């Protein structure tokens, strides 16, 4: 069974927080003050949970990719800055995922060199 977890970015305190419960009556606050990010049910090479909004470094067919984890039509992808999408898949062979930050605390990691 898939584990369902969320975290939020607290814009007021500028820090990431784990969601322990949700009150859907106040759901409008989630998008405005607290952007909600879902757990992908995948771990990186260091055993860290991968969430939506994480910046991930990965390899595909020996290509180095840095991008943001996002959900598209029910599937998790890594979107690089060049409008390319790569499926987020558990580690196998030469495919290795590593969380290097997130879009709120480490946006500079997405800037092209």
Task: Label each PLM-derived region with a short phrase.
Residues 1-113:
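Secondary-structure transition motif
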């Amino acid at each position: 069974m898939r584990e369902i977890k969320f975290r939020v970015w607290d814009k007021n305190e500028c820090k990431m927080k784990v969601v322990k419960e949700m009150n859907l009556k106040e759901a409008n606050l989630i998008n405005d003050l607290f952007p909600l990010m879902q757990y992908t049910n995948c771990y990186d090479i260091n055993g860290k949970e991968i969430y939506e909004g994480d910046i991930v470094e990965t390899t595909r067919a020996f290509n180095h990719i840095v991008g943001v984890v996002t959900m598209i039509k029910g599937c998790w992808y890594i979107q690089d800055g060049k409008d390319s999408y790569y499926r987020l898949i558990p580690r196998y062979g030469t495919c290795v995922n590593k969380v290097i930050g997130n879009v709120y605390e480490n946006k500079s990691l997405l800037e092209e060199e």
